[in-house]
């Protein structure tokens, strides 16, 4: 077989199963919207939960940062790419979330990969929720450590795995809010189980931080816990991109020596760090935004209760509607777009076979009429 034959066969298989991914050119717009080919749509497919990607304070902070620092960092943070803007953001994040230190990464994917690669050795084990993010699972598959996945949100299953002997150390990994189902982990139970000098607890709170807890401190604040490692990402509630890992001072110093994704990547632009600092201020003062998002979630769930589809048990901004077959999910998504609602069908392998879904996401930027328009389009599309 040639390389071309292998690639062609893989693409044909994806096409036949209605699982071929294609990108679509979109332009973000204010008010929880986007523009595609000159047409404005209500956007229910993004992760801009508080609408901050269009916030004037963030835009102004980025512009001012670019005037001060330029548009790129020009180097790894280990060389000359670490500015006072980066340091200020790290310090503010650590203070806000109650940790010694914060380390900035170019993405949450890179941060998860870096932690696993830097920490895990052959005698160690990773105990991860079965629905953990692909970044963690991919890193674990390349790690010399043993990966064991426990049943989703099943703290008893985790306890059983922890009860088994291990020659080395253990990393327990879960998420605050799961990206495809929108449900929350039983963090208090998991933290109570994952204790001891030989166990680290890491929580990826990409979809919880900013929208849950006091001042938006996230899922761990709601649960009243502080994990050993906390990942927050900036592509959701913060409205930008990048990520930060919160940890102890010794852990931060260790990762600065060993985390290759951090050492060998160009640092995020200082202007971006300025915008992220502005986003943090808006988030900490954003109770009104979080209340608006909560009202939108409640309005949607009340209206969607009678739909002839399975509505996932989620109280978060992620509201999945389980359709089943790939083709049916694609057809329904297209019907919604015809009604001016931009919705994306999520298909295997991102979700299990037979559970293709519309992953609806709500934002504080949406108004009542946006939610009502989505509900009307869903009822019409299901006829």
From Swiss-Prot:
Substrate binds at residues 21, 133, 350. PROSITE patterns: AA_TRANSFER_CLASS_2. GO terms for molecular function: 8-amino-7-oxononanoate synthase activity; pyridoxal phosphate binding. It catalyses: 6-carboxyhexanoyl-[ACP] + L-alanine + H(+) = (8S)-8-amino-7-oxononanoate + holo-[ACP] + CO2. It is an enzyme of class 2 (transferase). Its EC number is 2.3.1.47. Pathway: Cofactor biosynthesis; biotin biosynthesis. InterPro entries: Aminotrans_II_pyridoxalP_BS, Aminotransferase_I/II_large, AON_synthase_class-II, AONS_Archaea/Proteobacteria, AONS_Proteobacteria, PyrdxlP-dep_Trfase, PyrdxlP-dep_Trfase_major, PyrdxlP-dep_Trfase_small. Pyridoxal 5'-phosphate binds at residues 108-109, 179, 207, 233. Keywords: Biotin biosynthesis, Pyridoxal phosphate, Transferase. Its cofactor is pyridoxal 5'-phosphate. One of its GO terms (biological process) is biotin biosynthetic process. Catalyzes the decarboxylative condensation of pimeloyl-[acyl-carrier protein] and L-alanine to produce 8-amino-7-oxononanoate (AON), [acyl-carrier protein], and carbon dioxide. Belongs to the class-II pyridoxal-phosphate-dependent aminotransferase family. BioF subfamily. Homodimer. This is 8-amino-7-oxononanoate synthase. It comes from Cronobacter sakazakii (strain ATCC BAA-894) (Enterobacter sakazakii). The gene is bioF.
């Amino acid at each position: 077989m040639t390389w071309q034959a292998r690639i062609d066969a893989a693409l044909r298989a994806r096409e036949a199963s209605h699982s071929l991914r294609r990108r679509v050119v979109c332009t973000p717009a204010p008010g929880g919207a986007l523009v595609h080919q000159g047409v404005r749509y209500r956007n229910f497919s993004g992760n801009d939960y508080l609408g901050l990607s269009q916030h004037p304070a963030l835009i102004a902070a980025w512009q001012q940062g670019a005037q001060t620092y330029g548009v790129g960092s020009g180097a790894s943070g280990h060389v000359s790419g670490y500015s006072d803007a980066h340091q200020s953001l790290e310090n503010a994040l650590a203070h806000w979330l109650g940790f010694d230190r914060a380390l900035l990464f170019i993405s949450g994917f890179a941060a998860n990969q870096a932690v696993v690669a830097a920490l895990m050795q052959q005698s160690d084990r990773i105990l991860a929720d079965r629905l953990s993010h692909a970044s963690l699972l991919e890193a674990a598959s390349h790690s010399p450590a043993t990966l064991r996945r426990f049943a989703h949100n099943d703290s008893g299953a985790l306890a059983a795995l922890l009860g088994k002997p291990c020659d080395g150390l253990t990393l327990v990994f879960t998420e605050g809010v799961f990206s495809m189902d929108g449900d929350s982990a039983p963090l208090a139970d998991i933290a109570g189980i994952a204790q001891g000098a030989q166990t680290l607890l890491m929580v990826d709170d990409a979809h919880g931080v900013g929208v849950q807890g006091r001042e938006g401190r996230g899922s761990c604040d709601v649960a009243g816990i502080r994990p050993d490692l906390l990942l927050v990402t900036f592509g959701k509630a913060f409205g930008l991109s990048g990520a930060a890992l919160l940890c102890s001072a010794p852990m931060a110093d260790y990762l600065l020596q060993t985390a290759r994704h951090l050492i060998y990547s160009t640092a995020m632009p200082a202007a971006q760090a300025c915008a992220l600092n502005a986003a943090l201020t808006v988030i900490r003062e954003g109770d009104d935004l979080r209340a608006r998002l909560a009202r939108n979630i409640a309005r949607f769930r009340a209206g969607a209760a009678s739909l002839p589809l399975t509505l996932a048990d989620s109280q978060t901004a992620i509201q999945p509607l389980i359709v089943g077959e790939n083709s049916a999910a694609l057809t329904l998504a297209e019907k919604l777009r015809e009604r001016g609602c931009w919705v994306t069908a999520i298909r295997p392998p991102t979700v299990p076979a037979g559970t293709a879904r519309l992953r609806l996401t709500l934002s504080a930027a949406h108004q009542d009429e946006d939610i009502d328009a989505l509900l009307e389009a869903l009822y019409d599309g299901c006829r």
